[in-house]
């Protein structure tokens, strides 16, 4: 069981302190990727507390041939200084590589004990079905995709499919590159006004409202990224409570699909 709020590391340069503070506050799910070039930073931050962390990383879309997957996993393990990756994900689909070849390599990693769970990222429903059909032993447990109040397209088909098939949706960029994190960065229109109203009613910040909205959509968890300890604390305050039905309706109307 992973926490509702994790820690993203795309373009991360905050050092260990924000990650450690997030872990203290219960955000024990950390997501990285070989293409992020932050695996070493994550490894440094979790040194000595590995057993408390659900650690996820990704193999790049250009490394999806069988042997390339195995090499990429070994390199990620080395950079992070760990023996096991909890969740190993395909970062982007690659139509030039047969999905069965990639999935065979991922299943081998599970058999070896160096990977616990297999996931994907940026997969459509059709691509997700193909990945599932290519598996012979283990399930696809997650799909990491863009999702936030301003980008809701996955609600048309992907989130219903994932909920039906017990696949966790890991929402990246849940604050829309920070544009949902505060009044000064919101567009001067109805959306911003509604966000501010709901935040004031809830006694929460706009960022907490935006993240909590995502969490009301099963089966979604979020991985906001920040280089700041203060922002990490703010983000982690988005869990442990829920927006009301009326507040959700107003947000849905202000930010239509």
Predicted regions and their residues:
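Acidic (Asp/Glu)-rich catalytic clusters
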Residues: 21-23, 43-52, 74-82, 108-110, ...
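Acidic-and-aromatic substrate-binding clefts and catalytic sites of carbohydrate-active enzymes
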Residues: 12-15, 31-41, 62-67, 94-98, ...
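Beta/alpha (TIM)-barrel catalytic core signal, keyed to glycine-rich beta->alpha loops juxtaposed to Asp/Glu
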Residues: 93-257
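Glycine-centered flexible beta-alpha turn that most often forms the glycine-rich phosphate-binding loop
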Residues: 7, 30, 85, 118, ...
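Active-site groove signature of glycoside hydrolases
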Residues: 80-97
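N-terminal binding-site loop/beta-alpha segment at the start of enzyme catalytic domains
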Residues: 1-53, 178, 256
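Short, acidic/polar
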Residues: 12-23, 65-80, 101, 126-129, ...
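A short, structured active-site edge motif that brings together acidic residues
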Residues: 52-64, 87-91, 144-147
């Amino acid at each position: 069981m992973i926490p509702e709020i994790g820690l993203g590391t795309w373009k991360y340069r905050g050092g260990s302190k924000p990650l450690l503070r997030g872990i203290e506050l219960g955000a024990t799910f950390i997501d990285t990727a070989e293409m992020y070039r932050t695996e070493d930073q994550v490894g440094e931050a979790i040194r000595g507390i590995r057993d408390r962390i659900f650690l996820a990383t990704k193999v790049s879309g250009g490394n999806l041939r069988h042997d390339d997957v195995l090499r990429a996993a070994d390199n990620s393990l080395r950079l992070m200084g760990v023996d096991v990756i909890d969740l190993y994900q395909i970062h982007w689909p690659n139509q030039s590589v047969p999905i069965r070849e990639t999935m065979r390599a991922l299943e081998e990693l599970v058999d070896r004990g160096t990977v616990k769970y297999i996931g994907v990222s940026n997969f459509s429903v059709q691509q997700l079905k193909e990945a599932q059909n290519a598996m012979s032993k283990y399930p696809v447990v997650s799909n990491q995709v863009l999702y936030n109040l301003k980008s809701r397209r996955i609600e048309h088909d992907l989130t219903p499919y994932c909920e039906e098939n017990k696949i966790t949706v890991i929402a990246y960029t849940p604050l829309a590159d920070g544009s949902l994190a505060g009044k000064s960065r919101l567009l001067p229109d109805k959306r911003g006004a509604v966000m501010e109203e709901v935040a004031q009613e809830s006694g929460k910040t706009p960022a907490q409202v935006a993240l909590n909205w995502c969490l009301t959509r099963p089966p979604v968890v979020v991985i906001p990224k920040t280089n700041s300890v203060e922002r990490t604390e703010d983000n982690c305050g988005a869990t442990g409570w829920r927006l009301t039905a009326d507040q959700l309706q107003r947000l849905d109307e202000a930010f239509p699909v």
